[in-house]
Amino acid sequence: RLISLLENDKPAFGTFVSNGSLDEITESVDLGFDFVIIENEHAGMDFQDLRVSLQFLLDRRRIQAGEINEAYPTPLVRVSPNAEEISNNQWVIKQTLDLGAFGLLIPKLETIEAAQQLVDLCSYPVENVKGDIPSEGKRGWGPKRAARYWGVSIAEYVKSATLWPLDPQGELLIIGICESALGLRNLPDILSQVKGIGAVLVGPGDLAASLGLAGKMNHPTVESAVMKIGQICKDYGVPAA
């Protein structure tokens, strides 16, 4: 659902929910959001809570009625490690995707190297039958639970669990959070050279702190930086929020 909206240049509406907060999660389903971001950065990471949170995004009434056949709103997870820390925390990416998340939000995306490492860690090291996709897949093999959550066979999951728009038919989404002066400076190079970053989210709080204006998110300098991020994303055809 979310990727379909993005690839057709349609707005998508979502919200953050606390990992394990079933009231927040069920309300997000009932309110009709297009996606939800399960918060696992600042609120602590608990994979048992994440497993339960994902299950409560399955609206079985709508599934039985034939309206949908997967989790809706689309479940994304904001993980704890910053982009530069991902290489030493591969298990976080692996276990989050293995539970069936449809996408990841990655804090402090700042360099080309970190972005490419992220793309590689989210990609299986298998031959892609849909064309030449420039990614050295490093995702560990364990698709059984994710395939079950998606409601498909393992073969179908592996075929679909590729990164959009790197693979135009992919159903996984990486959203990089641009929230530092360094990230802003390197954003054009990241978006032009690493095609697996599907969208960008602005992090105004950390961005303000990085600019020496902690807590002053409405400062003109911070607002100008936010606008620059949006313009860069527009220039490179990458969805942003």
Where does each model-flagged region fall?
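Expand to "…catalyze enediolate/carbanion chemistry for C-C bond making/breaking, isomerization
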Residues: 1-241
